[in-house]
């Protein structure tokens, strides 16, 4: 089932997600719905807060990146429950990022080239992976969502900050019609 996305201005995008203690049918259904939602919106990753759930979980459809930068997509989306990042490489690189919760905008963000992630899969098995390049960037971006951080908090100053801010306000008003003005946050 495709779920409604939460957009910039929704308070859940600014909250730290709760760890998942047990993999229940509710969590399995959430993962299935998140995969459907990510695919419907043509995303490469999606965190639970982006579909209104404050739990530490994200899905991703990229398996890895080749040496020449080609993305290898997974047969089925990959699940990361309670992810923990470690061992970031020292030299950051800049790359463009976008977000399904901030449609139409992109920004340049410095992130480590390499990262290690330890998480649990949908079967409850703990795994550790060493990732680099765009795949590592996706992992860091989605993990940021679980901590209430958006890429716009980390990005380099946009070329036209006033126009960028106006675009954010437009997203806040256009996509959050289910929220009252008092509920909206930046």
Curated annotation (Swiss-Prot):
Keywords: Hydrolase, Iron, Metal-binding, Protein biosynthesis. The keyword Iron applies. Coiled coil: none annotated. The active site is at 142. Binds 1 Fe(2+) ion. Fe cation binds at residues 99, 141, 145. GO terms for biological process: co-translational protein modification; translation. It catalyses: N-terminal N-formyl-L-methionyl-[peptide] + H2O = N-terminal L-methionyl-[peptide] + formate. One of its GO terms (molecular function) is metal ion binding. Gene3D superfamilies: Peptide deformylase (3.90.45.10). Its EC number is 3.5.1.88. Its cofactor is Fe(2+). HAMAP family: Pep_deformylase. Belongs to the polypeptide deformylase family. Removes the formyl group from the N-terminal Met of newly synthesized proteins. Requires at least a dipeptide for an efficient rate of reaction. N-terminal L-methionine is a prerequisite for activity but the enzyme has broad specificity at other positions. This is Peptide deformylase.
């Amino acid at each position: 089932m495709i779920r409604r996305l939460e957009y910039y201005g929704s308070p859940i995008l600014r909250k730290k997600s709760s760890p998942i203690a047990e993999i229940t049918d509710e969590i399995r259904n959430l993962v299935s719905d998140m995969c459907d939602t990510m695919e419907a919106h043509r995303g490469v990753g999606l965190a639970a807060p982006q579909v209104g759930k404050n739990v530490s979980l994200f899905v991703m459809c990229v398996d890895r990146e080749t040496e020449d930068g080609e993305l290898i997509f997974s047969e089925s989306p990959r699940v990361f429950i309670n992810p923990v990042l470690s061992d970031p490489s020292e030299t950051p690189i800049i790359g463009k990022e976008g977000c399904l919760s901030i449609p139409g905008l992109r920004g340049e963000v410095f992130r480590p080239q390499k990262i290690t992630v330890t998480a649990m899969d949908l079967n409850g098995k703990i795994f550790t992976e060493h990732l680099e390049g765009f795949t590592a960037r996706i992992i860091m971006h989605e993990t940021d969502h679980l901590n209430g951080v958006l890429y716009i908090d980390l990005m380099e100053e946009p070329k036209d900050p006033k126009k960028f801010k106006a675009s954010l306000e437009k997203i806040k008003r256009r996509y959050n019609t289910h929220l009252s003005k008092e509920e909206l946050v930046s």
